[in-house]
């Protein structure tokens, strides 16, 4: 095997190990109910379905239920929605005092849309995959310590809650880096903050003994391959989500793909489910 190929493989393996916090991977059991929470990176997965497909390919006989509760603008403590009362905008008790002060205003929302806690309980969630950090990173380094306190409180609350039959398994996934797109962005400013927040997330995850997946570092290597993986540098396209899906599934779960032949049909079924 050529030396450059060996080096590439070793680099990938080292990166893969470095991107995990060291805690055990998620062990999905039969009939487990999995919920995604977080902001844009997780929210946009519903449009492409690749990550869900990768999970089902690894656990074809587990009768899993997967629901995506992510939405752009969400933070660990703030989940805005105009159709629920003011206190329902916050993800857990005490969150209002921990979120950015600009998000603490009373906007007079009204309605009966379920709160984040109600969704997790109604879904009887056993496993929670958390996609936070991207929009928070735009607050800059000066807000990092506040964000870490918000994230720490969220993880402690989530790990101590019971939504299904027992406390949920929890994993935290960092944002990917911004890809340089000519005429749009070189990503340097955004990536400086994203790296700072990724490292902060890793610290908080380790403190709470939560599996952490660094998606920022490997994404930089993906961009070096020369393929456009995003529509504007930040928001992934289908190719970007395909690559991210395989990386996340390998990083989060113990099982590998059982039958790749079913990928296309399974992806079609996932997309039909997500349409409704």
Role assignments for model-derived ranges:
Residues 1-10:
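Bacterial N-terminal signal peptides that target proteins for export
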Residues 9-18:
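Bacterial N-terminal signal peptides
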Residues 22-24:
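Boundary at the C-terminal end of the N-terminal hydrophobic targeting segment
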Residues 27-152, 162-169, 176-185, 268-276:
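Conserved SGNH/GDSL esterase-like catalytic core that processes O-acyl groups on lipids
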Residues 29, 46, 228-276:
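Conserved catalytic region of serine esterases and O-acyltransferases that act on ester linkages
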Residues 123, 157-168, 200-212:
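A structural motif corresponding to the C-terminal end of an alpha-helix
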Residues 142-150, 186-196, 232, 236:
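Alpha-helix N-cap and loop-to-helix initiation/capping positions
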Residues 180-215:
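Substrate-gating cap/lid alpha-helix
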């Amino acid at each position: 095997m050529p030396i450059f190929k060996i080096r590439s493989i070793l680099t990938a393996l080292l990166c893969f190990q470095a991107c995990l916090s060291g805690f055990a991977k998620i062990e999905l059991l039969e009939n487990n109910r999995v919920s995604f929470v977080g902001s844009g990176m997780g929210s946009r997965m519903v449009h492409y379905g690749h990550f869900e497909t990768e999970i089902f390919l690894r656990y074809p006989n587990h009768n899993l239920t997967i629901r995506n509760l992510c939405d752009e603008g969400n933070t660990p403590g703030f989940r805005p929605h105009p159709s629920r009362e003011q206190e329902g905008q916050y993800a857990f008790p005490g969150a209002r005092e921990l979120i950015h002060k600009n998000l603490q205003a009373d906007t007079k929302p009204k309605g009966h849309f379920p709160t984040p806690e109600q969704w997790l309980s109604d879904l009887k969630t056993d496993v929670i995959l958390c996609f936070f950090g991207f929009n928070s990173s735009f607050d800059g380094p000066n807000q990092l310590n506040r964000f870490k306190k918000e994230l720490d409180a969220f993880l402690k609350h989530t790990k101590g809650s019971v939504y299904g039959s027992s406390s949920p398994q929890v994993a935290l996934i960092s944002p990917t880096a911004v890809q340089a797109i000519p005429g749009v962005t070189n990503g340097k400013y955004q990536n400086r903050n994203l790296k700072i927040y990724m490292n902060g997330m890793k610290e908080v995850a380790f403190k709470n003994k939560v599996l952490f997946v660094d998606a920022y570092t490997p994404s930089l290597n993906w961009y070096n391959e020369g393929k456009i993986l995003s529509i504007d540098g930040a928001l992934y396209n289908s190719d970007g989500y395909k690559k991210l899906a395989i990386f996340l599934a390998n990083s989060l779960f113990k099982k590998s793909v059982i039958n790749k032949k079913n990928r296309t049909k399974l992806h079609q079924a996932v997309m039909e489910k997500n349409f409704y």
